[in-house]
């Protein structure tokens, strides 16, 4: 019996071989990774987080540049920290700006870093900031982080008023630029 009480999963040699082939051929993307920097996760068995991701077969991870009530300065600081990581270990990482970059990360056995926001508060009412952050590599964004902001209601708001005028404008701009609208919460 396993620790979770559900029993042990046993595969036949054929099933094991098939699952390894499928895993190796698939694109593996973590839609919301833990922190890669600020702080960097501690080594496990002497291996850095990036190395563990590569060994596990990940091809890309979505790293958060802004969450909760983060502002413009917070988001820029996180972008700077992740650019430093990309510069420090270019043999292990690549900034993801397109689908082709994800395929390249897989082909080169690197971890693709996808910049994401869990709130659009760093954008504020400045529509031009979408273009600026897109040029910095932003490719995925939740408009709200659970609570209401100028873009709309988050999942914790009982009224559920949906998107505001700014929110609708943001979705149009994100669609124009190719930034994924994340609906997680």
Model-derived features with residue positions:
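N-terminal hydrophobic targeting/anchoring segments and the immediately downstream early-domain regions
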Residues: 1-162
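Catalytic beta/alpha-barrel core
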Residues: 94-96, 179-185
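Glycine-rich tight-turn/loop motif centered on a GG-T
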Residues: 153-172, 176-180
